[in-house]
Amino acid sequence: MGRSISVSFGLLVVFLSLSGTGADQDCLPGWSSHEGHCYKVFNLDKTWEDAEKFCTEQGNSGHLVSIDSKKETNFVAELVSPNIKETRRTDFVWIGLRAEDKRQHCSSEWSDGSSINYQNWIEAESKKCLGLEKQTRYRKWVNLNCGKPYRFTCEI
């Protein structure tokens, strides 16, 4: 009987150590985990370029958030909404998408270099940087002036 309990306890310890005990186990304090990545909302007003630079300085291949699915859209929206402090600049939050003019052909990719596999535009406009809009509960992408300062979310 004692040996059976010991073996069962040992298996439980191995299972818990392999499965982890919390959602944020691999993320730094203050960061949130989702499908192998860590996310953090920053209540700092920065231009798109400065926000991207700030995210790269966070380490571990950090960039402005890239959104690859509806599931990730919902995760980011639910992370942003309660964590943005209300100011006049909280109507938009930068994401890592910017249209770049390469040889007069407009191409877009995430700031981490990954391709766009999922799209959630409000409407196409000529402005080159994208963000999430509060009016859509931070679930739709909107074109914004890259030089305006907004809050942002980093992903590592």
Curated annotation (Swiss-Prot):
It is found in: Secreted. Coiled coil: none annotated. Transmembrane segments: none annotated. Residues 34-155 form the C-type lectin domain. Expressed by the venom gland. Disulfide bonds join C27-C38, C55-C154, C129-C146. GO terms for molecular function: toxin activity. Keywords: Disulfide bond, Hemostasis impairing toxin, Secreted, Signal, Toxin. One of its GO terms (cellular component) is extracellular region. Pfam families: Lectin_C (PF00059). The keyword Signal applies. Its main location: secreted. Residues 1-23 form the signal peptide. Shows greater sequence similarity to the alpha than beta subunits compared to other heterodimer snaclecs. Interferes with one step of hemostasis (modulation of platelet aggregation, or coagulation cascade, for example). Heterodimer; disulfide-linked. Belongs to the snaclec family. This is Snaclec A6.
